[in-house]
């Protein structure tokens, strides 16, 4: 048996009669994790714009994003013609076939076994945790499939579906980030994984220049450092006038306490 594993890969702009991006057949096993499939096209009469899954093959897609793939017939994104397919923590959105961006043009099961869980799939699909809700990409038209604040993909995946040892997303950034602005709706213990190839990263904390030692609070240690540098320059020169003076002391006292 052939086992192929793809992680943090992008499949873009490919075209073929049967499988726009990747074809699995025989007794092969293919796994995709943190991958992006976009603008792939199947031109034949029974193709899948992104994936074609043949008899006896097994395909697993986890935390991957499928957008803007197309087919001239059947499934614009994934077609399973007799294999076993498992799709978890993924996003399938805006893939088109003859009928437009319908559920059948996101994923068509034709004689195979398909399980979809904790996935955003346009048009909906039966399975635990699945959603039919706009994933709110940063810029779908510009192929930026990172997640906007408030995306339904944030903290809504299943931690148990993430392959063991996976610690980063497509960008190589931390895979498990808890967004305090979003109620956890996925499966597992916080932090809950996001759906799709990109984990929503938290914005950096606001600058706190008076926190000279980086402890997260302006406190006595910072005051001591400022007084030790009095009359000179350096990090304690908070207003950048070249001199640690009363103005810098006033700024520090005004910022006293935890950095927020």
Listing of model-derived features with the role each one plays in the protein:
Residues 14, 137, 172, 212-215:
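Extracellular/surface recognition and adhesion modules
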Residues 106, 140, 156, 170, ...:
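Generic detector of well-ordered alpha-helical packing
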Residues 200-260:
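Cellulosome-associated attachment modules in secreted, modular CAZymes
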Residues 1-150, 162-163, 185:
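Predominantly extracellular beta-rich ligand-binding scaffolds that present long acidic/polar faces
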Residues 90, 119, 153, 172, ...:
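Residue-level detector of buried hydrophobic side-chain packing
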Residues 60, 146-148, 194, 217, ...:
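Short aromatic/basic micro-patch
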């Amino acid at each position: 048996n052939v086992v192929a594993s793809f992680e943090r890969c992008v499949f873009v702009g490919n075209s073929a009669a049967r499988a726009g991006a990747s074809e699995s057949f025989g007794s092969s096993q293919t796994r995709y994790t943190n991958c992006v499939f976009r603008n792939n096209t199947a031109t034949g009469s029974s193709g899948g714009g992104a994936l074609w899954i043949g008899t006896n093959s097994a395909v697993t897609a986890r935390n991957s994003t499928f957008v803007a793939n197309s087919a001239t017939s059947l499934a614009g994104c994934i077609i399973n013609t007799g294999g076993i397919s498992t799709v978890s923590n993924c996003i399938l959105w805006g893939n088109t076939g003859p009928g437009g961006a319908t559920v059948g043009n996101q994923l068509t099961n034709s004689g195979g076994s398909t399980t979809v869980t904790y996935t955003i799939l346009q048009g909906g699909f039966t399975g635990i945790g699945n959603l039919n809700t706009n994933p709110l990409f940063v810029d779908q038209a510009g192929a930026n499939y990172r997640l906007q604040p408030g995306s339904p993909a944030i903290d809504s995946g299943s931690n148990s579906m993430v392959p063991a040892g996976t610690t980063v997303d497509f960008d190589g950034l931390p895979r498990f980030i808890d967004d305090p602005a979003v109620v956890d709706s996925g499966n597992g213990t916080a932090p809950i994984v996001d759906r799709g190839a990109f984990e929503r990263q938290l914005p950096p904390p606001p600058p706190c220049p008076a926190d000279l030692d980086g402890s997260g609070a302006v406190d006595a240690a910072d005051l001591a450092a400022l007084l030790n540098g009095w009359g000179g320059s350096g990090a304690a020169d908070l207003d950048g006038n070249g001199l640690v003076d009363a103005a810098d002391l006033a700024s520090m006292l005004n910022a006293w306490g935890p950095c927020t």
